[in-house]
Amino acid sequence: PGINYKNNGMTYHQLKYLLWSVVVGVTLSLTSCMKWDYGDAVEDFNATGAGLFITNEGNFQYGNATLSYYDPATKQVQNEIFFRANGMKLGDVAQSMTIHDNKGWVVVNNSHVIFAIDLNTFKEVGRIENLTSPRYIHFLSDEKAYVTQLWDNRIFIINPKKYEITGYIQVPDMTMESGSTEQMVQYGKYVYCNCWSYQNRIIKIDTETDRVVDELKVGIQPTSLVMDCNNKMWTITDGGYEGSPYGYEAPSLYR
């Protein structure tokens, strides 16, 4: 959203679709060449206590994402812990990490994978593959979770116990090329999700039916979503960029 393009006679939507096709084709090609095999040289870790995991996104298409661990008791940081514990690189663009069921779930966006790791040894205990471009994971139970996507008009439903994709939630009025679902919060049986890139809404999902049942219009491109201790939702919009056919406005904060 922060890039301006010269169209050289092409319409904006034609150019955008062309760029989207190239990006998807290249990333899928790169991913197909990426090896997930374990290496021989691995280290043994035994982290205890209340540590802090740090996802280091890396450079897009460079495959240099890493994971770090900070121990407040010793005030020491261990870098490259995933590589050092497993003997393989984490992948391309570490987007987010969520802790659930005594595992760390690391979402690697441009490698189309989520790794589950042991919180003490940092070793992989499972993975979910064949995702489009995963962003965030939200757990409904030990056997059900939602995964938001970029470049897809669906939210994936997964079974964390089996590390399997079990279904999809179709987002209304969203195409594949403009697809963008981002962060999620839950209140009761409903999950709320902000739709970010070229979108201006927060959708409401019934977790019993796995369907979008309502939506709330906000400013252009809500980038994040949180819920406070009073069960009030907050979102920040980036407003798009000048010259965007979707529009541009000042960033805003909504409650």
Q: How does the language model describe each region?
A:
Residues 33-255:
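Predominantly soluble domains enriched in secretory-pathway, periplasmic, or organellar proteins
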Residues 1, 5-6, 11-13, 17, ...:
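Bacterial Sec-dependent N-terminal signal peptides
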